[in-house]
Every structure is written in C-alpha cells, then in structure tokens.
Amino acid sequence: MVWTRFVCSRLSAGLLGCVLLLCSPSPIRAEWYVAAQLGANFADPLRNVRGSGTLAGLDAPNFNLKTSPAFGGKLGVFPGHGLFGIELDVSHSTPHIKNLDDVPGIHLSVTNIGAHVVLRYPGVTWQPYIGGGPALLVARLGRSSTTESDTQVSVGGNVLVGIRAFVTPKVALFTEYKYTDSTFRFGGAFGPVGGFDATYRAHQLFVGLSYHF
C-alpha cells in the first residue's frame, strides 16, 4: 500500500510536470500538436483474479472482456522540431466483462491517461514514431446482481507505435497501435465483504487527425 501511494504520487507529479511543460511558454522554437483519435480496444481477459479484503486468498477464473470502441485525444510538443517529444494522451473505452456462466455481464469503463516520450523520424510527409511511458488508469465497475459500483485508479504503462502522414504542412493523418498493462484493484466490488484484484492488458488500434503549429 505504501509503495502504491509512493508510485501514484510520483506518477501524478510526472503527469503534472508534463502538463505544466506543455502549457508553459518556451524560448526554444517548438512544434506543438493536438490530435483526435478513434479506434477499437481489444482487451485480454482479466487475469490473476484474486480476492481482497475478507476474500483475500481466494482465486477466481479469468474474466473475459468485450471488444469495444475507443476514442480520445492528444496534446504534444517536439522541442526544436527535433526527434524527441512528449505528449499527454487520453483515451476512453468500455471493455465490459462478459457473462460468467450464469452470472450476467458487468459494465466496465476504462480511461487511460498517459504521459509519453515519443521518438519520431521527422520526415516532411511520412513520420513513423514509437513511444511509451507511465499511465493512470481510471476504471469504473458498474453495479450488477453480484457487484457494487466501484471506481479504482491504478498505475500502468503504455507502449505505442504509429505512423503519421501530412496531407498539408500543418494537418496530418495517423494510425497507431498502443499496448497497455496495469493491475486493477476493485476493493469495494462486493461491498463490505471485499473486492478483487486483476491484471488488465489491452491492445488498441487508432486512426486520427492531428494539427501541428
């Protein structure tokens, strides 16, 4: 618990620093961009499902998740129009938990807030890029016949690869793959009895439009 608080505080500080850097004026000429993205979230089953609270020590089978639409946006900067940049990436998806035998499915939504370092090839028309960094994942579990509504915030990581194609000097189309890994901790999923922890991993495919200035 202490380690989790420490990591969360460090990550929050890093995200805040990223936002402040993105929003502060810089004496160095930089290339800024904003982007909108739309795609699909292909989540692996929730694995390593373990009880928490009074249910600690109990294991459960994997929870299969549905494929869902995903959407979001980006705000980023390449200082000095160089190879390296940073970006704030926010995306949202709804990988609901599928039916568990005779138990109905459970609504699940996930908001991914990532602070990424990006390395690109700064071509005039084509710009392939890779990146990654820490993320905060805000997941909300819906109320069902077996669960209570619960929200958790966990630390995770994103890795991404994509390619951008400029259709004008300032407007580009892009496609991107992003992989996310985290551990969800729904401590109140079963009310006062306890909850569960599980490993969350997802693959996302996006297409988007970015404006550079």
Go through each PLM region and give its residues:
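Residue-level preference for beta-strand/loop junctions
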Residues: 30, 67, 109-111, 153-155, ...
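Outer-membrane beta-barrel proteins
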Residues: 59-63, 103-105, 120, 145-151, ...
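Outer-membrane beta-barrel translocator domains and adjoining extracellular loop/strand segments
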Residues: 46-55, 97-104, 140-148, 185-193
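Gram-negative (and chloroplast) outer-membrane scaffold detector with strong preference
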Residues: 42, 71-146, 181, 200-213
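Repeated loop/turn-to-beta-strand initiation elements of outer-membrane beta-barrel proteins
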Residues: 32, 82-86, 125-126, 165-173
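Cleavable N-terminal export/targeting peptides
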Residues: 1-31
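Short glycine/proline- and aromatic-enriched beta-strand/turn motifs that initiate or cap beta-hairpins
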Residues: 26-82, 204-213
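Predominantly the C-terminal beta-signal and adjacent terminal strand-loop region
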Residues: 47, 59-61, 168-213
